[in-house]
Swiss-Prot record:
One of its GO terms (molecular function) is copper ion binding. Pfam families: CutC. Keywords: Cytoplasm. SUPFAM superfamilies: CutC-like (SSF110395). GO terms for cellular component: cytoplasm. It is found in: Cytoplasm. It comes from Sinorhizobium medicae (strain WSM419). It comes from the Bacteria. This is PF03932 family protein CutC. The keyword Lipid metabolism does not apply. Belongs to the CutC family.
Length: 245
């Protein structure tokens, strides 16, 4: 098995530095990972244009569902412009209809606006009622990969579904498992899944250092911090699993 690419999601400058230091192959740049990841600020995008690994910006203007209107579309277009201006390698997109199916029209507009940049379809995919239909939409629109947990809370819970998605993709698009993947759980995915890349937060939970911030609504009781040591452990785990395959 070839070397498996490791994508790490981060939401602040320290996380970006840790991802590079730990050996991540690609970074998904966000804000508010506690809400599943939102669009990073232009300032953070600009800072991320310098690392020696490809960086993809999450384009998600708000928490909650992925059903977007014309005003959301305009915001996302401007966010894509900011990612391009910062020199980022790509963007992470997703949009749904009210019935949960992918919004092909909205995604066509977003993907078109991001022409020339790399494209990842985010976990709006995990909410669709028909994976086969959604996969074909992603292929048709030129997405490089689908980030997915197989519709489950975590990817290790949906290995059989991920196997089916990989078979259906048939090399036309990468299926990148994400959610709940750590150096302790990666062995449930590999070598069973013929994948080229995985997505992980490689983070550590830390309690808030000032409870006044929590009491006043400025911070959550705990936060996740990207951990370079966990990235190194994940990298070593993936390399060991690939060597055995």
């Amino acid at each position: 098995m070839n070397r498996i690419l490791l994508e790490v999601c981060v939401d602040d400058p320290d996380g970006l530095e840790a991802a590079v230091a730990g050996g991540a192959d690609r970074v998904e740049l966000c804000s508010a990972l506690c809400a599943g990841g939102l669009t990073p600020s232009p300032g953070l995008m600009s800072a991320a244009g310098m690392p020696p690994v490809p960086v993809y910006a999450m384009i998600r203007p708000r928490a909650g569902d992925f059903v977007y209107d014309a005003a959301d579309l305009e915001v996302m277009r401007r966010d894509i412009d900011a990612a391009r201006a910062a020199g980022l390698a790509g963007v992470v997109l997703g949009a749904s209809r009210a019935d949960g199916r992918l919004d092909a029209r909205m995604l066509t507009k977003l993907a078109g606006h991001a022409a020339g940049m790399g494209l990842t379809l985010h976990r709006a995919f995990d909410l669709v009622p028909d994976f086969a239909e959604a996969l074909e939409i992603a292929v048709e629109l030129g997405f490089e990969r689908i980030l997915t947990s197989g519709g489950a809370k975590t990817a290790p819970e949906a290995v059989e579904i991920l196997e089916k998605l990989i078979a259906a993709a048939s090399g036309r698009i990468s299926i990148m498992p994400g959610s709940g993947i750590t150096s302790n759980t990666a062995g449930t995915l590999l070598p069973r899944l013929a994948i080229a890349e995985v997505h992980s937060s490689c983070s550590t939970s830390e309690p808030a250092n000032d409870m006044r911030l929590v009491e006043m609504g400025f911070a959550a009781p705990e936060r996740r911090r990207t951990d370079a040591a966990k990235i190194r452990a994940m990298r070593a785990c993936l390399d060991a699993l690939a060597a055995k395959a």
